[in-house]
Amino acid sequence: MVREKVKVSTRTLQWKCVESRRDSKRLYYGRFILSPLMKGQADTIGIAMRRALLGEMEGTCITRAKSENIPHDYSNIVGIQESVHEILMNLQEIVLRSNLYGTCNALICVQGPGSITARDIILPPSVEIIDNTQHIATLTEPIDLCIGLQIERNRGYSLKMPNHFEDGSYPIDALFMPVQNANHSIHSYGTGNEKQEILFLEIWTNGNLTPKEALHEASRNLINLFIPFLHVEEETFYLENNQHKVTLPLFPFHNRLVKLRKKKKELVFQYIFIDQLELPPRIYNCLKKSNIHTLLDLLNNSQEDLIKIEHFHIEDVKKILEILEKNRKFISN
């Protein structure tokens, strides 16, 4: 456990971790301060951060399990102590950490007798288990058991739909919430017009993220929500039939490339892969996930299409514009 004395700055706004500990493999705690704040600011930031921590964070869970010859999820299998339902509940509790986008597959393939734990899950390189000792099932006889797993990274929660079983696979309720709890408190000091505040923020996580990582990610998510307001002067807002609509900034370089494409350049664009553009990893992964592999694929999508891509923001579109402008000569030749 790490604990530090609280020192209040009278000058620059700063944050600091004043306590950090790991209570167990699946329970981390962190306590942070932000100061000095003007009266009222601590509550504004504290409420926003708590909501971002509890509602906007992404997590990784097992969302589906598949094994042959299982009639329904409340059945029992000879040679296995637990029912299928109990095994699914145990899989639901497995805490994973990953940097993947979307879904991936994993596998359990063991021979009894013996105990099956999270250590027996064969995972892709992008996923790791927080607690290898988590129990899954007990094999009481020398039988072979193979279970295919689907792993997904998402936010919020996902409830399985009744009768929604595909090819003998069973959906698992998933809670994509690495932050188990978050609280904030305020300490006021000073008098009169010089009254200031210290914000205390407490974060508990399940090990998918550390409290410090959760604080950073929640902060980034909040910043991304407000970025469009910083560029409001670049956008045209208007009302039509009582509906609010937004017209995005022009895509000048896109128009220039469209002209090139009309000059028989389309074949060239088909063989310029986005790998060659040196895009940031997150933007690159989002484009690949949306089946955008070449410059031609990219140009066939409008700005509005790109904004609709999951986890994509207007700042990402502007970043692509900057990179295309930087590579103008390479693309135009």
Swiss-Prot record:
Alphabetical list of HAMAP family matching this protein: RNApol_bact_RpoA
Region (Alpha C-terminal domain (alpha-CTD)): 267-333
Name listed for the protein in its UniProt record: DNA-directed RNA polymerase subunit alpha
Keyword NAD: no
GO biological process: DNA-templated transcription
Superkingdom of the source species: Eukaryota
Cell location: Plastid, Chloroplast
GO molecular function: DNA binding; DNA-directed RNA polymerase activity; protein dimerization activity
